[in-house]
Design a protein with these regions (language model features):
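Short, solvent-exposed loop/turn segments that connect beta-strands within catalytic domains
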Residues: 37-42
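Charged, often glycine-rich, active-site loop that binds/positions anionic groups
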Residues: 23-35
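Conserved catalytic cores of phosphodiester-cleaving nucleases, focusing on short active-site segments
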Residues: 3, 31-33, 44-51
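Acidic, metal/cofactor-coordinating or nucleic-acid-engaging core segments within structured domains
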Residues: 60-147, 155-156
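Long, mid-chain structured domain cores
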Residues: 1-7
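A short acidic/basic microdomain associated with nuclease active sites
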Residues: 7-24
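Extended, charged low-complexity segments
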Residues: 137-187
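Metal-dependent phosphodiester-processing active-site neighborhood
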Residues: 45-51, 55-65
């Protein structure tokens, strides 16, 4: 929903169809979307999503490790291969010139290095939050508290991510988006 409604993204791979069983996670990224630029270009969005009971520092390594796995050549090639072999984009993109350009970009012969500048990685961390649990209305006090808390967690997350992933080739050309979503509790 966030990808479609906020970023106007097109679903490129319906991940639900690639689960092996009910308790299985989708392999590779959790979501695969294409965002069309107003100037006729496009971006590849490979998303990661986690649900935590807290955002303490120790929990932040798991999504970073998942992103590291996602950036490995075999996994990125697999995602691109699935995308070009499905007709999901054919149903959503009427501009045939753009569709051809997208499919050529994700062709098996295209270097991953050519894809990385088009790559966006949204990382959604849905988390239990005491600030949200103790709030009954959307007050300025609540907004300021949650902004301050999320800013602190985002700084910690990106510091850890840079330390772990900055050696990935063309890391600086990849766009990362951290989306922190507080909920009162899991139930």
């Amino acid at each position: 929903g966030i990808m479609k409604n906020h970023y106007k993204a097109l679903s490129a791979i319906p991940k639900i169809f690639y689960k092996q069983n009910d308790n299985d996670n989708a392999k590779g990224s959790d979501s695969v979307h294409i965002v069309i630029d107003p100037n006729g270009g496009f971006q590849l969005w490979l998303g990661e999503a986690k649900f935590y009971n807290s955002l303490e520092d120790a929990r932040l390594y798991e999504p970073i490790n998942s992103v590291e796995q996602m950036l490995r050549k075999p996994i990125m090639k697999k995602e691109c291969g699935i995308m070009t072999n499905l007709n999901e984009l054919d149903k959503q993109i009427e501009n045939q010139t753009l569709l051809k350009k997208i499919k050529e970009c994700f062709d098996e012969n295209t270097s991953i290095d050519e894809i990385k500048p088009k790559l966006h990685i949204p990382i959604l961390l849905l988390h239990e939050c005491q600030i949200t649990a103790s709030t009954t209305e959307m007050s300025d006090e609540y907004k300021n508290s949650i902004i301050s808390f999320h800013r602190d967690r985002a700084h910690s997350f990106f510091k850890k991510q840079i330390n772990k992933l900055s050696s990935v080739h063309k890391y600086s050309e990849i766009n990362f988006h951290l989306i922190l979503f507080p909920v009162p509790d899991k139930t």
